[in-house]
Regions:
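Non-cytosolic membrane-interface motifs at loop->transmembrane helix junctions
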Residues: 38-48, 75-76, 94-105
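Membrane-interfacial, low-structure loops and terminal tails that flank and connect transmembrane helices
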Residues: 1-7, 120-125
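Membrane-water interface at the C-terminal end of transmembrane alpha helices
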Residues: 106-125
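Alpha-helical transmembrane segments
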Residues: 10-20, 49-52, 72-76, 97-100
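Core segments of alpha-helical transmembrane spans in multipass integral membrane proteins
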Residues: 20-26, 42-66, 75-82
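Membrane-helix boundary elements
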Residues: 3-45
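Membrane-embedded alpha-helical transmembrane segments of multi-pass integral membrane proteins
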Residues: 18-31, 60, 79-90, 104, ...
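Membrane-helix boundary connector in multi-pass membrane proteins
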Residues: 67-100
Length: 125
C-alpha cells in the first residue's frame, strides 16, 4: 500500500524541482544571458516556443504546489516525462547539458507518477 505521505512528499519534490529549475532557465532565456543561453541556441521563434512551454510548466507547477491535487499533477508529470525522455532523440546527443538534466528530472517525475498511480489504484479498490 502506497502511503499518502510518500505520494504527497514526492509531489512536492517534483513540483519543487520544476520550480527550482525553471525560474533560472526562464530568466536566462528571457534575458538572453550568455554563455548560458548558448545551450538552447540563438534567439529564434523555436526558442520562444520552448520558453512558452517552460513558462507554462512553471506556472502550473507553482499553482499545483499550492493545491496538490494528484489528478492534476499526474498529466503534467506524464507530459514532462515524455518530452524529457525524447530529447536525446530530438537533440541527437546524450552529452548536451539540457538532455542530461531532462533525463534526471524525468526519473524523479517517473517515481512521483508511479506513486500517484499506485495510490489512486489502491484508493479505487
Amino acid at each position: 500500500v502506497i502511503s499518502t505521505n510518500n505520494m504527497s512528499r514526492m509531489i512536492r519534490v517534483s513540483l519543487s524541482v520544476n520550480i527550482a529549475v525553471l525560474i533560472p532557465v526562464c530568466t536566462v532565456l528571457i534575458l538572453n544571458i550568455r554563455p548560458l543561453v548558448d545551450v538552447w541556441g540563438p534567439a529564434t521563434p523555436a526558442r520562444g516556443i520552448l520558453l512558452s512551454m517552460y513558462l507554462s510548466i512553471l506556472l502550473l507547477s507553482a499553482g499545483l504546489w499550492l493545491r496538490r491535487n494528484p489528478m492534476l499533477v499526474a498529466p503534467l508529470l506524464a507530459m514532462q516525462i515524455c518530452y524529457k525522455l525524447t530529447t536525446p532523440i530530438t537533440v541527437g546527443s546524450l552529452t548536451n547539458p539540457v538532455v542530461i538534466s531532462n533525463i534526471a528530472i524525468a526519473i524523479v517525475h517517473a517515481v512521483t507518477l508511479w506513486l500517484i498511480v499506485a495510490h489512486l489504484r489502491a484508493s479505487a479498490k
